[in-house]
Amino acid sequence: MAYPLQMGLQDATSPIMEELLHFHDHTLMIVFLISSLVLYIISLMLTTKLTHTSTMDAQEVETVWTILPAIILILIALPSLRILYMMDEINNPSLTVKTMGHQWYWSYEYTDYEDLNFDSYMIPTQELKPGELRLLEVDNRVVLPMEMTIRMLISSEDVLHSWAVPSLGLKTDAIPGRLNQTTLMTMRPGLYYGQCSEICGSNHSFMPIVLELVPLSHFEKWSTSML
């Protein structure tokens, strides 16, 4: 999860988020090199007194600054497309959970179970226990098994919402009348916090998401107790 004054991205806790972090570093390095080159050329232009008033064309230079940007764009596009295909790929999910956005709470339904569903509301600040996080805690956490592929079906009952958990690299729009899907998987247990990431009204900032990833045996006990 994020912490105060954090300058970087949250720690990756899923394979997709690890790929996104690598892509971020890869792209940032390209931007840094381009910026350094541009600043160097500008500094030369400001400090040198040499001029080329007789130069009418420079075919070699034009060729270079056409081919080089094309190569740079390819170096950025290829890993980006790879990650996009990885995010869209859903192969034999072990569990499917349907989440619906409301003003201003989330509801969840475990579609593999006959009657396992609940609403998840933010806990008001005055009701928080010591150590709990303001604007991030909910009354019902989404308990999921770790090390398993989970399909999330996401939609909305009223207005546009967005179901987002940054540390897992997830952000999927919840659109009324449309069912979007995404997958999540994490290799270690823990609590993962997120929030609605689409302005949806006056209480938009009061729609937290809390995922509790646990070993499969713990998940089975929890699901049995909820039925």
Curated annotation (Swiss-Prot):
Binding site for Cu cation A1: 161, 196, 200, 207
Residues that coordinate or bind Cu cation A2: 196, 198, 200, 204
Gene Ontology molecular function terms on file: copper ion binding; cytochrome-c oxidase activity
Gene Ontology biological-process annotations: ATP synthesis coupled electron transport
One cellular component (GO) term of this entry: respiratory chain complex IV
Physiological role: Component of the cytochrome c oxidase, the last enzyme in the mitochondrial electron transport chain which drives oxidative phosphorylation. The respiratory chain contains 3 multisubunit complexes succinate dehydrogenase (complex II, CII), ubiquinol-cytochrome c oxidoreductase (cytochrome b-c1 complex, complex III, CIII) and cytochrome c oxidase (complex IV, CIV), that cooperate to transfer electrons derived from NADH and succinate to molecular oxygen, creating an electrochemical gradient over the inner membrane that drives transmembrane transport and the ATP synthase.
Quaternary structure and interacting proteins, as annotated: Component of the cytochrome c oxidase (complex IV, CIV), a multisubunit enzyme composed of 14 subunits. The complex is composed of a catalytic core of 3 subunits MT-CO1, MT-CO2 and MT-CO3, encoded in the mitochondrial DNA, and 11 supernumerary subunits COX4I, COX5A, COX5B, COX6A, COX6B, COX6C, COX7A, COX7B, COX7C, COX8 and NDUFA4, which are encoded in the nuclear genome.
Name of the featured protein: Cytochrome c oxidase subunit 2
Organism from which the protein derives: Phoca vitulina (Harbor seal)
